[in-house]
Amino acid sequence: MSFALGQRWISDTESDLGLGTVVAVDDRTVSLLFAASEENRLYAKHDAPVTRVMFNKGDTIESHEGWSLDVEDVIEEGGLLTYIGTRVDTDEANVVLRETLLSHQIRFNKPQDKLFAGQIDRMDRFALRFRALQNQYEQHKSPMRGLCGMRAGLIPHQLFIAHEVGRRYAPRVLLADEVGLGKTIEAGMIIHQQVLSGRAERVLIVVPETLQHQWLVEMMRRFNLHFSIFDEERCVEAYADSENPFDTAQFVLCSLDFIRKSKRRFEQVVEADWDLLVVDEAHHLEWNQTKPSREYQVIEAIAEETPGVLLLTATPEQLGHESHFARLRLLDPDRFYDYDAFVEEERQYQPVADAVTALMSGEKLSNDAKNRITELLSEQDVEPLFRIIESSAAEDEQAQARQELVDNLMDRHGTGRVLFRNTRAAIKGFPQRNLNLMPMPLPSQYATSMRVATMMGGRMTDEARAMKMLYPEEIFQEFEGDSATWWQFDPRVNWLLELLKENRNEKVLIIASRASTALQLEQALREREGIRGTVFHEGMSIIERDKAAAYFAQEEGGAQVLICSEIGSEGRNFQFANQLVMFDLPFNPDLLEQRIGRLDRIGQKRDIEIHVPYLQGTSQELLARWFDEGLNAFGETCPTGRAVYDKFADAIIAILATGKSDGLESLIEESATLNKALKSQLEQGRDRLLEVHSNGGDKAKEIAEQIAATDGDTNLVNFALNLFDTIGLNQDDKGENAIVVTPAENMLVSSYPGLPYEGCTITFDRETALSREDMNLISWEHPMIQGGIDLVLTEGVGATAVSLLKNKALPAGTLLLELVYVVDAQAPKQSGIARFLPKTPIRIMMDGKGNDLSAQVEFESFNRQLSPVNRHMASKLVNSVQKEIHGLIDKAEISMEERLESVRTDAEKEMKAALNSELERLQALKAVNPNIRDEELTQIGNSNERTIWLYW
């Protein structure tokens, strides 16, 4: 090492000091001043851990005055370097810049500059960086991107709808699955895909106020999408940042009532630029041809300004054909412009549905059925398929011919592209519901307090009185005080204790209407029998609820009982339990179905036991009988329940308000008759073609199988743990597929993306994550992985490395140079270019003669043969072969250009094939089905042209 005053060096061990200047040299030591950090360092001259900073022709360097110079020549004189070139800011030529006057805060951005400046990283970090690039590329190319990372079971019909809709440009669809089939999850998967692909950057979700928390939790816990709830208070706070408060967040969640009640907020929502609008409970948007409701007009105004719209409703169109048309009108007002025309068009589609029913039955096709199919499809297309169906061909061949006819008929279906509806009748695998009604005597304490409350009721409305009489424990506490221990004499509590003792090995979910009841029940179970239980109510934070749910889910040492309030249980499902206790009853059938739906969902493997204790001679008994005998709402899902309730609401409320059974028998009889008629109407009106289209058939199963095959990916596990090690996160293996990850003091960064300050528990196993709500399911799409990859690539981790290869077949001193180039097409995310040309790593390995060995030498096997070198020694080795490395980099550039051309060509072919195929299919469909939107065709055509232009 030769030192001279004024030379510039960089520390190998403390690169954050900046660029140092030699200020003193003697026989044994050298002293450097690091002006940027105002530090001095004294080193032993013969082995100083520093590297000389030398720039070359073509580099751009910065002076201490702030201007930059494009280097055209380098002169060395007296051990000091002088750079000559052109100033970037003034274009002045032949400008001289001595190395002593270089910027003290110089940064090395190119990997080769870092290498020559001694900023050399470890080999394991270089390997991590390459794997990060490789995995990022593979994930962007995956056709399942956006579907693999959700914390949800792999339900085929949900995955099919999400896959079908999520890839569209600005999807505008109606999701109308029956209760319990997962519309919220379908919407979340679509949102997730749209966000990951860049098609949607700003999303607005509008829901009823009572469902805000449910949506917030579902989006965060299942999809790692962090929405902000906007109310008046949040809007006022946001004024400091923007005139329009809705511009201050990318993902916004608010209630329909909030927007409807304030003209100002409504106008601000409409003015904000949204990419995707999601509306839950869309059947509440009332409409008729003369006077649409205010709620409908609000959503209509937002939908007109928003490219993508998802409407969610569980109400079948047969129960309100006009409102069904109104929802479709929100999606495409040009297509659905006239109700009478729509009714006539729907009537014309009936033969299509009849033909599909005939095909799917597997029975011999009648002449009528064949004639109907021939009217809808061309004769030359169907005749060969008819011959196969009627021949003695193998069953598989016949089934394939029937399926091909069904597929062709689907393309002509009126609303098949904008409407998806799955029914329990069409999707198998749901458990039985077993009802256990438990009548109990009314305690005298309750009888007295209820009698007094009735006398003191004054001008209370019938509805308020009916609601009050359902909860006698609350009436008792009104007179005796909040501390009154009603649970000491309530027979429902004694019965519950016996039930829990008889079923000690079962998890039991208890739901009560009020949070106060839930809390006092937990106290009663704990104090009277020492039963392990936990509560779940709206007064708890999301983290507290997660912990309670996790405690309940825990198999060993967990809670036997989870006691929920009505609101607190929204959006939470506990399929691992099959025992449901309704300590009291909700006021309407929708809430009753919501309660049972906590357990009765796809994924439930056992029959559900529904226990309903009630006090005889009270409103509880009357309501239980009406739900059971009038609706059969306990025994099966009741899509007609709300319609029946609305019809008889006045009579129901009047009976519940008095607590007397006068008129109950006739009410039950009339309700049962109407319920049966409505269900029959639903069954007759079932659109089997739509159901077949919505559940996806074999294609849906293939999607589920593809995703299942990626679960438990050992490559992901190894990469994630290696990533966490490199960043410096603490990892504590807790067993049961669980690892606790927490921030450490000496991390590479101050905070890690996606990791809370207090840390979190992670798992790579989907089933574990589904049963443990306190765990994060780690996938390639999780923020901790995506954020970690971005961190590695942006922070320069592993940009350079030096290693030794111990191989007797190679002579000592053999130089191998491994380079990784990244093809990065700069374009807006919305362009969709990442689908065909994501960031693509090109690996080149040069031997000393300039031959590219990358095809013969695979990265991982080569990496396993390498031994680490300390940084100081690595810097010396690099300096000794710096000239050779420069030459090899020049040759590698030529090889890279050839490979780049191949990458471009392949991407262009793939893009043309995909987009042209998609465009041709949609154009052909538009000829027979007007539900293909012109905007979608235009967008695909524009994407095609724009993407070709971007490549060249």
Curated annotation (Swiss-Prot):
EC number: 3.6.4.-
GO biological process, one term: regulation of DNA-templated transcription
Domain Helicase C-terminal: 492-668
Coiled coil region boundaries: none
Motif position, DEAH box: 280-283
GO molecular function: ATP binding; DNA binding; helicase activity; hydrolase activity, acting on acid anhydrides
InterPro entries in the record: Helicase_ATP-bd, Helicase_C-like, Helicase_RapA, P-loop_NTPase, RapA_C, SNF2-like_sf, SNF2/RAD54-like_C, SNF2_N
Keyword field: Activator, ATP-binding, DNA-binding, Helicase, Hydrolase, Nucleotide-binding, Transcription, Transcription regulation
Family, per entry: Belongs to the SNF2/RAD54 helicase family. RapA subfamily.
Subunit structure: Interacts with the RNAP. Has a higher affinity for the core RNAP than for the holoenzyme. Its ATPase activity is stimulated by binding to RNAP.
Protein's name in the database: RNA polymerase-associated protein RapA
Species this chain originates from: Aliivibrio fischeri (strain ATCC 700601 / ES114) (Vibrio fischeri)
